[in-house]
A protein has these predicted regions:
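Charged low-complexity "KEKE/polyampholyte" interaction tracts
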Residues: 384-390, 396-548
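A contiguous strand-loop segment
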Residues: 30-154, 175-304, 309-318
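Surface-exposed, proline-enriched loop/turn segments that connect beta strands in immunoglobulin-like
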Residues: 556-561
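Surface-exposed, flexible coil segments in extracellular/virion-facing regions
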Residues: 595-616
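Solvent-exposed loop segments of extracellular immunoglobulin-like
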Residues: 578-594
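C-terminal low-complexity, Ser/Thr- and acidic/Pro-rich disordered "stalk" regions positioned immediately N-terminal
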Residues: 645-686
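A short beta-strand segment in extracellular, disulfide-stabilized domains
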Residues: 568-578
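C-terminal membrane-anchoring or membrane-association module
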Residues: 698-714
């Protein structure tokens, strides 16, 4: 969290307690969450935080390429080299993603090392993820014996340093600890350091003391900038806890060490403040309520006449949630406003500060999947600007080597014209140049937050629909990613992120245009309704089509070969679907039938563009057909070949009755409908043939005689 310089310096003076309690909300306003894999419906771990500073503060998402012997320099105290932290790493850094400040905000645009400022969240090519930092605090007793160090490492460089050098989460913990041992800490923070096997919460406790604890699979955690959330841990078990050498001996030697009843050092109560302020306390109560593990008024906390939580009783870093979270619930946790309890609901009480507030600059959640290789185990979900009215974008950030520049301008070239410390509706109504997604969601948030009564509900509902579509389709893309050979995964990661960015931008840009038109019209008598939102059915009128870019149609019923008589009907058909989790994508499939020519090549048949095709049967012979099925995204699947064989139709003589045929040897018409007589065929010279002939002659003579008699009678 970007903390104003005056506030950081106040942490080192005697006015700390009074200042923090009276400090304006932006000074301490980040919230960190952790959900162990046994407390989720997916079996995945979720961890991350939101970064709070001001309503219209520019952040950029991008990829830092490796650097030889990188220099880490801080302008946190002043834009003069040497006044802050500076360190040169000997070696080549790892590639990593970042969510970085515009260096112009720090007068660092002309200093290559210092320009990599406040990178906050990312994953490196080794699969190590960092979310940094959650600003915390220390108490006056600790300040007196181990004050913070101006030239120590602080939030300005923490994420860049860790992502540049860490080969694993534990390696990151150890390397950061060594830096603090040597250079000290510029501020008090908690930092998430995770990989595909473990997640650590690293705490900068004071000038030179630190501790890192490994998070369990059965717990959750919410921390809104509170240094004193307690966590009992065996300090001698290095599989669960790493720490500075003097983390116990220093406070013990000065008689400020706090212990549990059994004598175990209570590190966080020893170092943290007793009360971090009502804004922090209220957000902790909101977070616990969100996860179904609500704190009890009077028992666990007290409130003032405005409903703000003024103090916490025995607050803990971890707890057992009352619900199991899915991906959507994990993402939305950083937008919580106390909706689960009217007494904590910031939508009902403007005096309450909320986790989901109008000063968030970006939010990140890392979804970590056990059992997968480090290159694809972690999905970084990133929401630009305030996440209350935003959509998180997923990326395989360990693999990512590029981002679409239209949507994510480089951190050192982005136009900062549209930003500001205060929210500005007039600025949000101005159409911006380019397609910067940060500015699109910044303006959406400004308009929705400041017109909550008429716009907030339907905008949030519509964005939730889009978010759920992205989540469902990410599962589809993930199946493809896991099946993709390792050497081809980076290409898919880059294309997938570009595709989801484009799809979300198109939806968000259209939404913003409609919101601006609504506000400019000045008529709020009816609630704003996004044109793409089907409120009755709780869906969008046209879906996000992220996974569609990678899922070809699946042919479920192949065309079958047919044999028929000349002139008869020969019908071919195909059935197909698109397994992309997109409603209505099957209805957008198109078809084209082809016939094989004498040269062996297939050519398209004019007008044969349906799932069924009736082949021509005017000529005797065989022809081979196939069909191409194309998705709305242009991906094609080709069917098996099917052969239509046309045979010569049976020839009937004039006057011949149905069911009769002519005996080739005797020219005698026989009734084939009657049952054949048992025995051999008649042969020339057989008595049966003579008998038949005589009977025939006799019959003819009899008829002629009858005719003559009839004539005479006349």
């Amino acid at each position: 969290m970007r903390l104003p310089a005056f506030a950081k310096k106040a942490f080192r003076g005697g006015i700390v307690a009074a200042l923090v309690l009276a400090m304006p909300a932006p000074a301490l306003a980040c919230t960190q969450v952790y959900i162990g894999k046994n407390q989720t419906t997916t079996g995945d771990t979720y961890v991350g935080r939101d970064e709070d500073y001001s309503p219209r503060y520019c952040k950029t998402f991008g990829v830092q390429q490796p650097i030889d012997n990188p220099v880490f320099r801080s302008f946190e105290n002043d834009s003069v080299p040497g006044t802050g932290f500076e360190y040169t790493y000997q070696g080549r850094s790892y590639r990593y993603t970042y969510v970085r400040d515009n260096p112009g905000a720090w007068n660092a645009q002309d200093d290559e090392a210092a320009s990599r400022v406040y990178s906050e969240a990312g994953t490196n090519e080794r699969g190590v993820s960092v979310s940094a930092t959650l600003t915390t605090d220390y108490n006056d007793g600790i300040d007196a014996i181990d004050p913070l160090v101006d030239t120590g490492i602080g939030e300005y460089n923490l994420a860049d340093y860790l992502l540049s050098v860490s080969s694993s989460a534990r390696d990151g913990v150890e390397k950061l600890g060594a830096i603090i041992d040597q250079y000290g800490s510029q501020d008090c923070n908690q930092i998430v350091i995770a990989d595909n096997t473990e997640t650590w919460i690293f705490a900068q406790l004071s000038g030179h003391q630190w501790i890192a604890v490994k998070m369990g699979d059965d717990v959750a955690s919410v921390n809104p900038n509170i240094g004193g959330l307690q966590y009992k841990v065996n300090l001698d078990d290095e599989s669960q806890c790493l720490h500075s050498a003097d983390v116990v001996t220093l406070p013990k030697s000065k008689d400020v060490l706090v212990t549990y009843d059994d004598g175990t050092p209570n590190i966080f109560k020893t170092y943290g403040k007793e009360n971090s302020g009502s804004s922090q306390n209220t957000r902790l109560a909101q977070g616990r309520a969100y996860f179904g593990a609500a704190l009890a008024p009077q028992t666990d906390y007290t409130v003032d006449e405005q409903g703000r939580v003024t103090s916490l009783i025995d607050p803990q870093l971890t707890f057992t949630p009352g619900i199991k979270s899915d991906t959507f619930a994990a993402l939305r946790s950083l937008a919580a406003r106390g909706e689960q309890d009217d007494s904590l609901n910031a939508n009902l009480n403007s005096a309450l500060y909320a986790i989901g507030n109008n000063r968030t600059t970006e939010s990140n959640i890392f979804q970590i999947r056990s059992g997968l290789s480090s290159d694809i185990a972690t999905i970084q979900w990133e929401a630009l600007s305030r996440c209350e009215f935003s959509v998180y974008l997923p990326s395989y950030s360990a693999l990512l080597t590029e981002v679409p520049a239209d949507y994510f301008p480089a951190w050192n070239t982005v136009d900062g014209t549209y930003t500001g410390r205060k929210d500005d509706v007039a600025q949000a109504l101005v159409e911006k140049d380019g397609k910067n997604l940060d500015y699109v969601f910044m303006d959406i948030n400004t308009l929705a937050y400041n017109n909550r009564a008429s716009m907030g509900e339907n905008v949030r509902a519509y964005l939730d629909v889009l978010q759920k579509q992205v989540i469902a389709q990410q599962d589809v893309v993930d199946g493809l990613m896991q099946a993709t050979p390792a050497d081809q995964r980076t290409d898919l990661a880059n294309k997938a992120f570009a595709a989801v960015s484009e799809q979300v931008y198109n939806k968000a840009a259209k939404l913003l245009d409609e919101m601006r038109a609504y506000v400019n019209a000045g008529d709020t008598s009816s609630a704003f309704m996004p044109s793409d939102y089907d409120a009755e059915n709780g869906t969008s009128r046209t879906p996000i089509m992220y996974a569609s870019a990678f899922v070809a149609p699946s042919i479920t019923a192949q065309p079958q070969s047919v044999t028929c008589a000349q002139g008869a009907e020969a019908k071919l058909s195909v059935a197909a679907t698109v397994d992309d989790s997109v409603d209505g994508s099957d209805a957008q499939l198109t078809y084209q039938w082809f016939v094989k020519g004498e040269d062996g090549n297939f050519s398209a048949i004019d007008g044969a563009t349906a799932a069924e095709y009736v082949a021509a049967t005017t000529e005797v012979g065989s022809k081979v057909y196939r069909v191409e099925v194309t998705s709305a995204a242009g991906l094609v699947s080709t069917s098996d070949e099917a052969t239509v064989t046309v045979t010569q139709a049976a020839q009937e003589e004039p006057g011949q009755k149905p069911g009769q045929k002519t005996d080739v040897k005797t020219d005698v018409k026989t009734d084939t409908a009657k049952k054949a007589t048992k025995g051999g065929l008649a042969k020339t010279g057989d008595s049966s043939v003579v008998t038949v002939a005589l009977l025939t002659v006799a019959g003819v003579l009899a008829v002629m005689g009858a005719v003559l008699i009839r004539k005479r009678a006349n």
